[in-house]
Amino acid sequence: MIDQTAFIHPSSIVEDGAIIGAGVHIGPFCYIGSQVEIGAGTVLKSHVVVNGVTKIGRDNEIYQFTSIGEVNQDLKYAGEPTRVEIGDRNRIRESVTIHRGTSQGGGLTKVGSDNLLMINTHIAHDCVVGNRCILANNATLGGHVSVDDFAIIGGMTAVHQFCIIGAHVMVGGCSGVAQDVPPYVVAQGNHATPFGLNIEGLKRRGFEKETLHAIRNAYKLLYRSGKTLDEVKPEIEALAAEHPAVQAFTDFFARSTRGIIR
């Protein structure tokens, strides 16, 4: 179903069954598969491929040579009906690739809203990217990676499969991330190690001084106390009882499966 207010360039192909919302603009030489849904106001500049069972929300900007919803690169994949879901108001720049999920990983690759995916970003099967994240040029997420809200991943950085990048994290460019990065942390290097807290980013997002002080105390317990993670968990939990922002650390520890960067 194609809304009558949508524009589709004559050189583009939209297969029967695709759902194209109001005000969608599909530029030249695009291909839209039969199981694709594109929400109102989304713009495909040119030479964009959207395939598979893929749902794209409203008011996204998708630039040329991007591929969304194609078959993933997991050798175990045997054509199962897996999906891609993308939220609203994302800017997806040139040559980005977002692959469909696998049955082993829950069947869904998901990108939230208000993200900036710069040139040549790769989001592999079963990844979950939150809201208001920035992935700089050539950032690469392996399969099953989670990137939480407000995270920034620098250019040419690779994240190992199954890793978690916590909320408000900043990972420097040309890094290799092989373990989980706790919330609020700045990480850099190959393998990535912690370099303090993303204080400037937190200030810009309205974190108050008292909250920043509590986050600093949690960071010091985690990285400067000389104690193991199991030893500092109760202390961080006690701090979280007084300062809700610290709860992000305890929630993160419960999700972590690869260990945290050191």
Swiss-Prot record:
Record's function text: Involved in the biosynthesis of lipid A, a phosphorylated glycolipid that anchors the lipopolysaccharide to the outer membrane of the cell.
Organism: Pectobacterium atrosepticum (strain SCRI 1043 / ATCC BAA-672)
Subunit structure: Homotrimer.
EC number of the protein: 2.3.1.129
SUPFAM superfamilies, alphabetized: Trimeric LpxA-like enzymes (SSF51161)
Pathway the protein acts in: Glycolipid biosynthesis; lipid IV(A) biosynthesis; lipid IV(A) from (3R)-3-hydroxytetradecanoyl-[acyl-carrier-protein] and UDP-N-acetyl-alpha-D-glucosamine: step 1/6
Gene: lpxA
Family: Belongs to the transferase hexapeptide repeat family. LpxA subfamily.
Catalysis: reaction(s): a (3R)-hydroxyacyl-[ACP] + UDP-N-acetyl-alpha-D-glucosamine = a UDP-3-O-[(3R)-3-hydroxyacyl]-N-acetyl-alpha-D-glucosamine + holo-[ACP]
Any one GO CC term of the record: cytoplasm
Uppermost EC category: transferase
Signal peptide coordinates: none
Transmembrane segments: none
The protein's name: Acyl-[acyl-carrier-protein]--UDP-N-acetylglucosamine O-acyltransferase
Pfam families given in the database record: Acetyltransf_11, Hexapep
Chief subcellular location: cytoplasm
HAMAP family per record: LpxA
Entry's Gene Ontology BP terms: lipid A biosynthetic process
MF annotations from Gene Ontology: acyl-[acyl-carrier-protein]-UDP-N-acetylglucosamine O-acyltransferase activity
Compartments, as annotated in UniProt: Cytoplasm
Keywords: Acyltransferase, Cytoplasm, Lipid A biosynthesis, Lipid biosynthesis, Lipid metabolism, Repeat, Transferase
InterPro entries linked to this entry: Acetyltransf_C, Acetyltransf_C_sf, Hexapep, Hexapep_transf_CS, Lipid_A_LpxA, Trimer_LpxA-like_sf
